[in-house]
């Protein structure tokens, strides 16, 4: 759960955090008994706890398909991300990955921590994949093949232009959007979304991750991962790694703001995609990551800490997003809130200020025109008073102690 200091600063985070903790424990108890499916769902919770929670709400067949789709692409991404693997070894693997998923003897040791376990024990994923219906398998194979080919192209090529950037993000994330749309359609729950809208859903998430993960990627050993396009960063520095040096702080923030402004291009498509969804579980599955993305961009914008350490939404705010996101009205309200937060940070002296403000105002107009911005809704940007009396602190301590005792008493004996 969130740290005590964060909870005391934001006490209204407590209930959503409690609900999230209970939901996480419930999800862990829902892991299937079959060995290959048990491995897959267990691994899903390890590589993405929040994704693992949201996926549990999908119908059984679709849930299984999305779980395997995610793990297959996570494994493919693990190969691509491992900078210790030579190009000569890496390219053939990613190119043939769509074939490996049919081979329950195949595995390839790479990555670290839980990702290494995923790769070493990949036969479990293959066995689960083979259990899926044919329409699900065909969709997963097709997207894996196309993604592997795209990754192979950019293993041998740098991201030079904004077009390159969009193409790379299409291969590694836009295709995920296309694949999920195919799975939703195959389940019978949704109409097939257009490729353009599906692609934008993936690009918005991927560009947010690329922005947020600058420092981690540039410091990767033995070789940096560089995804920011030269067409953008070369306006501010001579080399991409120069952005992390303190003497370039001013230019670094301007470059960061340029990158965020580029990512905002996809928001209108994302709102349209989500507004077309009919199934409540699929809607939540799609909407929660998009809200996390706009929230992360609001935190990153004009924030030098992107080049100094980790910038991410606090766990309590994440819990609120998961708890409150149920309808399209919730999405419009949240996008409006975070776009207001972002807008308040725009410096009129920033070289891209006019463009940034124009894109934010377009987003806000869509949200306002939706009719969802009622006075009764809860805002994400109204901060709580930071000072609390000792009685409230004592009460929170007691509640936390009771909760800890309850959860501890219900832990499985093996833990």
Curated annotation (Swiss-Prot):
Disulfide bonds: none
Compartment(s) of residence: Endoplasmic reticulum membrane
Molecular function as annotated in GO: squalene synthase [NAD(P)H] activity
Gene3D superfamilies linked: Farnesyl Diphosphate Synthase
Key word Transmembrane present: yes
UniProt xrefs under CDD domains: Trans_IPPS_HH
Function: Component of the triterpene saponins (e.g. ginsenosides or panaxosides) and phytosterols biosynthetic pathways. Catalyzes the biosynthesis of squalene.
Protein family membership: Belongs to the phytoene/squalene synthase family.
Protein name: Squalene synthase 3
Gene for this chain: SS3
